[in-house]
Every structure is written in C-alpha cells, then in structure tokens.
Amino acid sequence: MRSAPAIRACQRICRCLLSGFGGQVDGRQPEQLSKGTGSFVGPVRSQAELPRNEPREAPESGGEGSEPLVEICRKRRFLSGTKQQLSRDSLLNGCHPGLGPLGIELRKNLAAEWWSSVVVFREQVFPVDALHREPGPSLPVDNGFRLVSAETLREILQDKELSKEQLVAFLENLLNTSGKLRENLLHGALEHYVSYLDLVNKRLPFGLAQIGACFHPVSDTKQTPDGVKRIGEKTEASLVWFTSARTASQWLDFWLRHRLLWWRKFAMSPSNFSSGDCQDEAGRKGNRLYYNFPWGKEPIETLWNLGDHELLHMYPGSVAQVHGRDGRKNVVPSVLSINGDLDRGMLAYLYDSFQLTENSFTRKKDLHRKVLKLHPCLAPIKAALDVGRGPTVELRQVCQGLFNELLENGISVWPGYLETVQSSLEQLYSKYDEMSILFTVLITEATLENGLIQLRSRDTTMKEMMHISKVKDFLTKYISSAKNV
C-alpha cells in the first residue's frame, strides 16, 4: 500500500496531467478517466516557444453572450453554441463549441486573403506543412500539452506495487516520451529550414508560411477548479522570415506596415486596427497588432525578432548547415516570427461590420435594421436567389439555372428559392442582411416574360432591374473591384 506522501505526489502529477482534459465549456465538472478513453492531453512546455500574450482573467459574468452581435451570429450560424457558451472570454480564448457554416466560410475567406497577400504574390515565400503534434523528447521546463495514452496512464496509476519514486519516474518518462500539441507554428518552420535553404541556394531573405490549428492552456477557475487548465484552440496564420541580422530591423518594420495595412483593408472602420511595441522576458522586442473591441483592445497578431537562438537550438553542433548568404557573406540568419490569430481576426471583422440602422421597412421608430457589412471579399455568401409571385415550378427552374452558373464562376450563393416557409420580402431582406449577403436576386413572373430580375443591395438597400444574363458579370466585377481597393 502506498504511503500518504506518495498519494499526494500522485495527486499533484495527475492534476498537472489532467490540465486541458476535462474542462467543459458548459460549466460541467471535468470528466473522469474512463476505460473508453483513448488518449488525453496534459501540459508541458514547447521547445520552439514564442512569447505569450498577456494572461486573461475569466469573465466576471456571462452576460456578454447575449449582446446583439453574438445573438445574430448564433441565429445566422456564424457561431455554434448557447449564450452561456459564447461569453467574451470563451470567444477570445478559443474555448467555445465552434463555428457554424457561415463562420467557417468567413474564416476560410479570411485565410485565403492572408495566403494571397503573404504567399501567392511573393517570390520569396514558400508554403510549409507540419504535424499538429511535435515529436521527440521534451525539455525539463516544457509545459505545453502532451498527448498521452489513457490506457498507459491508467495502468501506471493502478499499479499498487510501485513506490513513490517509481511512480513519479514512470509518469515523468511517459510525459517526456509523448508527443506534444503545438502552441504555435514556429517549430514546424524551423524543422524545415535547412531543406528550404537548399531550395533557394542559401540566398537570404526568404520566408515559410503555414495556416493551421494551435493549442494553448486557458485558466478558468469557475469552469475547472483545482488548477486544471482547459485547452484553447485557434487557427494561426504564420510567416517565419529568415533574414540577416543586418537587415532584420528593416524587415520587421516592413512586415509591420504590411500587416497593419492588410487588416485595415477589409475594415469598415480602419482606425480600430492599431499597432504597439512589446517586449518579452528575455528582452526581445516586437510589435503587436490590436483591434479595438467595445470592451478594449485585444491582440490579433504579433511580430517578433527572435534573433538566431531558436535556429541554433534546433540545429546544435553544426553552425555551417544553417548558414545563409547575405551578399557574399555566410551568416546565421535572424528569425522574424509573424503570427496572426484568424479566429480573433474573424471576431474583429464581425464587430467591425455590425451596424444598427434605421429600418426602412417599418414605421416604428424603435426598430432598427441589423446588418453585417462584411467586406465583399470576406462575406461568406455573395448572393441570395429567391422567388416572387408567379408559377413556382418555372421560377425555381430559372433559379436553379442561375444558381449553377454563379457557382461555376466561383460565386457563393444562398438557395433561398428552396425555402418552404413563406416569408415577406422585408423578412427575407432582414435575414439576408444579418447573414451579410451582398445582393438579393429576386426572380419573378417578369423574368419569365422579359428576362428581368430585381437586384437588391445589402449596403444601400437600393433595388434595380437587371437582365438575368448580366447578373454573373455584374457580381464578378463587383467582387473583383473590391479586391483592388
């Protein structure tokens, strides 16, 4: 039988192991380790670690989830979950149930714009892909999340023959030999550095870009008592830029300007995006980009000059293999890390686009039109097709033909004509405004007679008549011109 000190040691280690495993977003207690569980995650520290954002306090109340914007995002399927699950902090920390179909499309569009801006139109940036987990032994100070077999852990804990020292040794060995969930994308880029260095014939500068899910510990004493941490998840867009130390400061300034202008490009109120200096515990300097939410500024992207420390740590013993060419000189490059949180960025654009305007559909002055005026490039759905008065079968056939034509040309469409519940045009327009749909195309009996449709704009609420054959070209040019602004 184990001694009391051994039991207390087990409890401390298990509390550490269970961090991130059982924190439920709906406020339930952490789940117990059951026989049906295959693996779970415990915290350790990542080797290639970026300076962290400032820790956040848990929300004082859950009232933030009932605000008008979050309610619209739930109603129109940008976000999934209940009001209680969609508190301010759960959205910022990535501890909510997830995105709805429109939220998925919005984040996909945001990621596509980032990729085009950073990778596609730049000759010195290359895509890279890395595992969600980082293999290999961990360092003693490592406190990132570990992937541990629940069955293996159960066998160790249930072995009553083990002494305190043996139990601790087994558990530490289990942690040290298990893979860890990545907290950022830096480690993967550094792993691929040498192979890409050969690709560019060792010429500096160049960059490696990746978009992927990352995981981080979140403290919330209300949800998870006894110090057990929950797992927060975010979609990170990362550019790791390798340059000589001589030009590192200039490149950091360049990317700071580039990234700030990029965020502002898609905003209704560009001034809500700003930048500021920051510094980590080691004295390394960097910059943060912020969005000014109604409650205050929150970071959405960070830029760091990490020097050569991480690169030399990744490739110990052979400095020559990491040398790049700066003109005629062989140098160990400085590493610039530019990593943006696309989930926070998406939340920023939802707040930026949300407007309450006077409702022209009603004479009641206390009612307002709620509209999400997302940038045309980011809007999840560009057009909605609906039917007015006339023979239903024939009108739906026309809608189906136009639907297929628009999809074939890369224009996302909402098939409102398939709806079986009757709604007034005013109700349809309100619904589509809240879904941030740019244009509503109304197919009526007149379309069957002369080919004319009614086109209604989300931003102006103006309606105009247009021949159905011109709709595709009009939408294509509208979206294309918005990209170039």
Swiss-Prot record:
Role: Accessory subunit of DNA polymerase gamma solely responsible for replication of mitochondrial DNA (mtDNA). Acts as an allosteric regulator of the holoenzyme activities. Enhances the polymerase activity and the processivity of POLG by increasing its interactions with the DNA template. Suppresses POLG exonucleolytic proofreading especially toward homopolymeric templates bearing mismatched termini. Binds to single-stranded DNA.
Subunit structure: Heterotrimer composed of a catalytic subunit and a homodimer of accessory subunits (POLG:POLG2).
GO molecular function, one term: DNA polymerase processivity factor activity
Source organism superkingdom: Eukaryota
Pfam families, per the entry: HGTP_anticodon
Species of origin: Bos taurus
Region (Disordered): 28-67
GO CC list: cytoplasm; gamma DNA polymerase complex; mitochondrial nucleoid; mitochondrion
Subcellular compartments: Mitochondrion; Mitochondrion matrix, Mitochondrion nucleoid
SUPFAM superfamilies: Class II aaRS ABD-related (SSF52954), Class II aaRS and biotin synthetases (SSF55681)
InterPro entries (UniProt xref): aa-tRNA-synth_II/BPL/LPL, Anticodon-bd, Anticodon-bd_dom_sf, Gly-tRNA_synthase/POLG2, POLG2_C
Protein name, entry field: DNA polymerase subunit gamma-2
